[in-house]
Amino acid sequence: MARSTPCSQTSLAVPTHFSLVSHVTVPSEGVMPSPLSLCRYLPRELSPSVDSRSCSIPLVAPRKAGKLFLGTTPPRAPGLPRRLAWFSIDWEQVCLMHRLGSGGFGSVYKATYHGVPVAIKQVNKCTKDLRASQRSFWAELNIARLRHDNIVRVVAASTRTPEDSNSLGTIIMEFGGNVTLHQVIYGATRSPEPLSCREQLSLGKCLKYSLDVVNGLLFLHSQSILHLDLKPANILISEQDVCKISDFGCSQKLQDLRCRQASPHHIGGTYTHQAPEILKGEIATPKADIYSFGITLWQMTTREVPYSGEPQYVQYAVVAYNLRPSLAGAVFTASLTGKTLQNIIQSCWEARALQRPGAELLQRDLKAFRGALG
């Protein structure tokens, strides 16, 4: 095993028999208790019975079947549903490659799993808010049962990890693409031969991407799931030029919101994209995601940053003075097409959630707009 590293570093100890391109982080010891009642969230194939073998990362001793496992199986955490404690990752089939990015609660790496490209997310335990890290891990699994072209799919998950690592858990996800919508909007793609921003974000491309995102939201909302952190950085663009909503660390099930009467600290997200009712600490609804989509569409159209200034002042002005990004630019006022975009965006970020369109109506309007353009 490689030498363990401090919490602030991203390199990671990995079993020597892994096929590696570079060092990354593998999750932490023990099993993390869930703050949510999550027994319904994982499909059966991701949570085998307690008689199954440990899903801990393989380290030393070969067992009868020829696979490598920890010498002893860690005890199941008290309070965890029996099946949830046995997430299933075949670690011998994981080939870690390189880090794609990092955020407040962990890092994401590119890898292969059973020879297929995947992304591996590891949630750090060394953070300022351990409970928030735990919530982020379990929230990612809200979509474990879901399959949709515009949603990044969860492949497998585990809370069992080597003793020296700094991770609460590992989630293996479909590899949604090398580029985010944020990178496309602001011209910071990692593609070896990037197109110009203008070529990538023609009106037709904006509407195509918008429909991808709204299709994903419509599906999520039909499953009673709210994303609650929709923004360009959390939208991946695949090699097939399809947008996929990713990063569900702030997501919530509607029934959990109603039951727990979530207070503001239960809902994370990005203040520039948060609806006024979320900033006020009210219970979230699907219309909060529609608001975030409105800001995102404005970014695609203008290729500008939504706000400048201190976050607390922006948040106050959004709630108290109905502050929004400017719709006065020529892109919105110089043509009938621009005015149509202006109306769609304005409807999405209405102050009152009830006045915003639902995902189904928004999908219909965008399809009609796209069709009218030919």
From Swiss-Prot:
UniProt cross-references to SMART domains, sorted A to Z: S_TKc
Stated family: Belongs to the protein kinase superfamily. Ser/Thr protein kinase family.
GO terms of molecular function: ATP binding; protein serine kinase activity; protein serine/threonine kinase activity
The organism's taxonomic lineage, starting at the top: Viruses, Riboviria, Pararnavirae, Artverviricota, Revtraviricetes
E.C. number(s) listed in UniProt: 2.7.11.1
Gene3D superfamilies with a match to the protein in the record: Phosphorylase Kinase, domain 1, Transferase(Phosphotransferase) domain 1
UniProt domain Protein kinase: residue ranges: 94-370
Protein name (database record): Serine/threonine-protein kinase-transforming protein mos
Residues where ATP binds: 100-108, 121
Catalytic activity: L-seryl-[protein] + ATP = O-phospho-L-seryl-[protein] + ADP + H(+); L-threonyl-[protein] + ATP = O-phospho-L-threonyl-[protein] + ADP + H(+)
Keyword Hydrolase: no
Family matches, as CDD domains: STKc_Mos (cd13979)
Sequence intervals crossing the membrane: none
